[in-house]
């Protein structure tokens, strides 16, 4: 019963004409009906519906929530999670757009990535340019992209948020309610200050981390979905090691939005390893965790189905190995005490059908073509 309640809470859409939320059966039907319209050939539709309804197998919960017009408009909304490094100014607005689609973001602020960012201007000047923010996910992301581009050139624009619908207004296509203009105002002001403090140099790892966390903060306010983030950093990065030390929740509340992990690229010596664990203990936050990239590459090579020559990252739950700019295609088998070998084989087959269908959802509207390329190559 609790599982059904959680599924209804997270995935059922509001039916305004009937003044109620979908039932669990209606949610499942909407997903499977969307799937059947997209896939040619014979599918075990009735069996898929029964298995999802009875919580034997599960598709992507994001696809379950958005199946229909929202998912048709942009397939980004069909994926639970993603990963990208902050190696280009576009990383910021891509992360924003993906989070606004309800998809979690793993990101890296390791030095080999943030060192690829351009230098920030030496001086800043107020300009008469006004960024008019359109009232959509695309409008928000484009406006933030424009802001970041101008700040890199030392120009501080004005912005007009008058077209953004008020907080609490219903989002008819995507579901949920609007954040309102206030969180966006806060993000823009925060970003301006971070760039001004970085004048004449590149953004540091902690500055990039804070901008992404602040982006996630505005999505939480919207009530669309609680933003999920994981931030990877170098083992030797003292600033990121201390990101959640002291009273960080007073001066840097945005850091609560991300779990933090050190990316291990080789076996550290005992001294470095113990320093990291001492810092974890002293912080009382349980962070940083460990992401072993070297091990991830070895696992990929051992399985023999994927190209191991990538600097892999991971999703916020750290349950999947992802390329630079790739989405996590998730389907699940729910194992019960009553299962035997045959029933498990049947469940795995059905979950595979769901995952195969979801892998065809590569119509991404805003992000770079690399996302589609990676998803298609690893289908």
Give each language-model segment a name:
Residues 1-379:
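Extended catalytic cores of very large enzyme megasubunits
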């Amino acid at each position: 019963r609790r599982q059904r309640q959680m599924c209804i809470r997270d995935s059922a859409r509001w039916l305004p004409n009937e003044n109620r939320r979908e039932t669990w059966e209606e949610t499942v039907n909407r997903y499977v009906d969307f799937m059947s319209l997209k896939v040619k050939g014979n599918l075990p539709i009735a069996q898929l519906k029964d298995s999802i309804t009875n919580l034997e197998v599960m598709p992507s919960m994001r696809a379950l929530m958005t199946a229909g017009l929202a998912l048709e408009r942009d397939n980004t909304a069909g994926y639970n999670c993603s990963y990208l490094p902050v190696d280009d100014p576009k990383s910021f607005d891509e992360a924003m757009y993906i989070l606004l689609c309800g998809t979690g973001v793993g990101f890296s602020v390791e030095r080999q990535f943030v060192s690829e960012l351009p230098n920030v201007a030496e001086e800043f000047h107020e300009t008469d340019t006004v960024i008019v923010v359109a009232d959509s996910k695309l409008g928000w992301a484009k406006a933030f992209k424009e802001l970041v581009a101008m700040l890199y050139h030392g120009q501080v624009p004005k912005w007009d948020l008058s077209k953004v619908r008020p907080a609490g207004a219903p989002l008819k296509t995507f579901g949920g309610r609007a954040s309102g203009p206030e969180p966006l105002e806060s993000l823009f002001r925060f970003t301006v200050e971070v760039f001004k403090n970085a004048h004449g140099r590149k953004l540091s790892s902690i500055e990039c981390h804070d901008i992404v966390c602040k982006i996630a903060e505005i999505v939480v306010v919207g009530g669309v979905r609680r933003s999920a983030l994981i931030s990877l950093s170098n083992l030797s990065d003292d600033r990121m090691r201390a990101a959640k030390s002291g009273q960080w929740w007073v001066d840097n509340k945005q850091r609560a939005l991300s779990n933090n992990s050190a990316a291990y690229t080789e076996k550290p010596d005992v001294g470095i390893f113990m320093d990291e664990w001492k810092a974890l203990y002293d912080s009382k936050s349980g962070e940083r965790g460990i992401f072993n990239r070297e091990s991830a590459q070895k696992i990929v090579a051992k399985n023999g189905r994927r190209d191991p020559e990538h600097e892999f990252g991971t999703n916020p739950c750290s349950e999947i190995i992802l390329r630079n700019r790739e989405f996590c295609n998730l389907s699940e088998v729910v194992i019960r005490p009553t299962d035997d070998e045959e029933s498990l084989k049947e469940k795995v087959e059905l979950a595979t059908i769901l995952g195969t269908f979801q892998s065809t959802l590569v119509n991404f509207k805003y992000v770079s073509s690399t996302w589609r390329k990676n998803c298609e190559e690893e289908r």
